[in-house]
């Protein structure tokens, strides 16, 4: 296997802290895989003492698959490849007694957080609740507990938010629930404050690799330091020019902190790009050179210099969508390309609607990569909430989610009285439903409905420990969920899709459980807890982009990171869109918008098109726009400015007919 000099250095250096500054398309995943192989085969590291951290489950699965191609199954399975949250969950389970958490805890996602904060805040609008959730998340990611926030609160609104943080934390504790932030917050606090735990995990992880270092936030960097505090044996791989997630807490200054905290840091810069033409890289380098840099880096390629970069000016967003798609069809016809070779990238999701209209009109097959997770679908959230409640009866959020799904005639007044009673008795909603005193405040039929639901959950919880697979296979029928969906959705496409989705998840859970209980049924509930936690963490059995099918692919610039396409269109390259209007006042924000444009440009392999509209409708008002400042920063000798051409009806029909005829001829020749 051939490597360039910088890749060789990156793979072989293990004598202390190492930063691999990996430019776009420089083969970073290949380097990480081969560094793991080098650690095992050449340096004789025990595979189970090597941990690699990625940011997504998809990236972790890809890395596992590629390691499997190089190492034997037995060896590759010992290497831990994980996300930060999955590793945090493992630490929590391992150190659960020190953390004073009950073993049947469940995990909250963002939607659950919003629902509970809505209860706590009471009568406040949803956008305000989202602000509170974000503040709590920010505090946890800065390692701040409620009492610490109280000390630094400088305004009445901060103090108010601190109180919500306090109440929210108390709710989590009483319900035996962790949110996503806790999965990193709790292990980091523990490793910081408990020397024995810190040493134990330093001995478990003797070499640490972290991918996408530019996406780390304050607490993740702190966790990296704690996990490697004994030996400083780590390799961090990232690119400061691709740091585009500050809105999610990513801190580009972690590069600066790294240089300061580790004076003996070895920095290896990989600049050789194996993806894009020389001209595309020249354009990308020129753009990003306008940012301040922690490191000097300039991408180069040994591939052809390539065709000119085209900038298309359109009258408005409709004209932009039309001309881009006509250009795409003509280009496809001229170069015998496939639709899957093309990507249309945009800054914000609202931009895609007009493109969808013309894609349908021109009969172009397409796929929009949306950031909607499989887990967020109502039927999946219901199923997981049932399982959470079966595992953990203290989970009040799960109780509220499913107590009336299917409908059981348990109204808002009944639930409010139950909440008040449970608070008075210091019990979960589940246990309060069984309290003998509840009959004094609830009508008989309401109490009966409530207790029948609780008895149903208790029965399933008991039976699942005896015959787990059979109980799970019959779960949807037992809770009468399918009948309820049938009545609600009346055999519509949505009903069919919902039943199919439930079946996918249940089959996945059943298969995982079958594998775990092959040797013993003794720990069924523990296994189920692990499986549900894993599913919630994955949060993405959603459809990924389908590379093998012949679709034009549309996605945001953020979603395009890590992907590559032969031909790329970046649309809406104008002031207020890219850069985004909210990010045009502060230099740091402009730098990130520029990095976002850079990420889009470096997705292209052979040909790049950029477009902007002279007028755009925003919030119902047509406004005049200006081409993005980023276009002026590109090397003008390498770009061609084009005006959109409005075809008359005959030209349009002739154009579409020629493209269709050529496409049909190609299909017949296959």
Curated annotation (Swiss-Prot):
InterPro entries: DExx_box_DNA_helicase_dom_sf (IPR013986), DNA_helicase_UvrD-like_C (IPR014017), DNA_helicase_UvrD/REP (IPR000212), Helicase_Rep (IPR005752), P-loop_NTPase (IPR027417), UvrD-like_ATP-bd (IPR014016). SUPFAM superfamilies: P-loop containing nucleoside triphosphate hydrolases (SSF52540). It is an enzyme of class 5 (isomerase). Keywords: ATP-binding, DNA replication, DNA-binding, Helicase, Hydrolase, Isomerase, Nucleotide-binding. Homodimer. Pfam families: UvrD-helicase (PF00580), UvrD_C (PF13361). This is ATP-dependent DNA helicase Rep. GO terms for molecular function: 3'-5' DNA helicase activity; ATP binding; ATP hydrolysis activity; single-stranded DNA binding. It comes from Buchnera aphidicola subsp. Baizongia pistaciae (strain Bp). Residues 278-562 form the UvrD-like helicase C-terminal domain. ATP binds at residues 22-29, 275. Residues 1-277 form the UvrD-like helicase ATP-binding domain. Belongs to the helicase family. UvrD subfamily. One of its GO terms (biological process) is DNA replication. Rep helicase is a single-stranded DNA-dependent ATPase involved in DNA replication; it can initiate unwinding at a nick in the DNA. It binds to the single-stranded DNA and acts in a progressive fashion along the DNA in the 3' to 5' direction. It catalyses: Couples ATP hydrolysis with the unwinding of duplex DNA by translocating in the 3'-5' direction; ATP + H2O = ADP + phosphate + H(+). The keyword Transmembrane does not apply. Its EC number is 5.6.2.4. GO terms for cellular component: cytosol.
